[in-house]
Amino acid sequence: MTASILAAQIEVGEHHTATWLCMTVNTDTVLSTAIAALIVLALAFYLRSKVTSTAVPGGVQLFFEAITIQMRGQVESAIGMRIAPFVLPLAVTIFVFILISNWLSVLPVQYTDEHGQTTELLKPAAADINYVLALALFVFVCYHAAGIWRRGIVGHPIKLLKGHVAILAPINLVEEIAKPISLSLRLFGNIFAGSILVALIALFPPYIMWAPNAIWKSFDLFVGAIQAFIFALLTILYFSQAMELEEDHH
């Protein structure tokens, strides 16, 4: 009986909604996404000013320079900077955007709703399946557009289905359809699981809740960074596969 009461108090996967232009939107996800986007833009202008200045690089600049160097190495080894220089800024932007979206939920910003329950104001956007699907579909469209640009409007779908062995064309088609699904569900599953754990910790008595909450929030920073890096890394890999030519093997 007690377990049933506690389970009923856990609210995970529920979102505050509103109707905009005859469409129902999750306002908490929109808020987190908008704040993350503004932070990314602010960081871009800040780092741009630091790069063009003669001052000693600070910690923030060195952190993002390290990320850019790491991503540049991945793009160079997978595709080649001369072939697809546009993949590097795209991968870095996706990484930073997802990273900030994930890390926003770590901030101790809470409020009490009309039912008297304490709720996080900034929920992780990646815990909303709509957010991760939109990101994955954006990447899906971008790397196929790059593949058409590199291989041609006829050559790209032929190479896509044929792969390295023509007889595996049906499997290659299923694999291609599964890419955005797996890319989105990987990110969603990890972040959503974190939301469930936070909801469980919230049921602890206040005098001991701070300890597991602090431990999990620290680990959540690590999980958010790893998942953002994996998403960006797979983005580079998918661009590499979509832009590969036959002569690249010779």
UniProtKB/Swiss-Prot annotation:
PROSITE patterns: ATPASE_A. Gene3D superfamilies: ATP synthase, F0 complex, subunit A. It is found in: Cell membrane. The keyword Transmembrane helix applies. The keyword Membrane applies. It is a multi-pass membrane protein. InterPro entries: ATP_syn_F0_a_bact/chloroplast, ATP_synth_F0_asu, ATP_synth_F0_asu_AS, F0_ATP_A_sf. It comes from the Bacteria. GO terms for biological process: proton motive force-driven plasma membrane ATP synthesis. Pfam families: ATP-synt_A (PF00119). The chain crosses the membrane at residues 27-47, 83-103, 129-149, 191-211, 219-239. Keywords: ATP synthesis, Cell membrane, CF(0), Hydrogen ion transport, Ion transport, Membrane, Transmembrane, Transmembrane helix, Transport. GO terms for molecular function: proton-transporting ATP synthase activity, rotational mechanism. One of its GO terms (cellular component) is plasma membrane. F-type ATPases have 2 components, CF(1) - the catalytic core - and CF(0) - the membrane proton channel. CF(1) has five subunits: alpha(3), beta(3), gamma(1), delta(1), epsilon(1). CF(0) has three main subunits: a(1), b(2) and c(9-12). The alpha and beta chains form an alternating ring which encloses part of the gamma chain. CF(1) is attached to CF(0) by a central stalk formed by the gamma and epsilon chains, while a peripheral stalk is formed by the delta and b chains. Belongs to the ATPase A chain family. Key component of the proton channel; it plays a direct role in the translocation of protons across the membrane. This is ATP synthase subunit a. The lineage of its organism: Bacteria, Bacillati, Actinomycetota, Actinomycetes, Mycobacteriales.
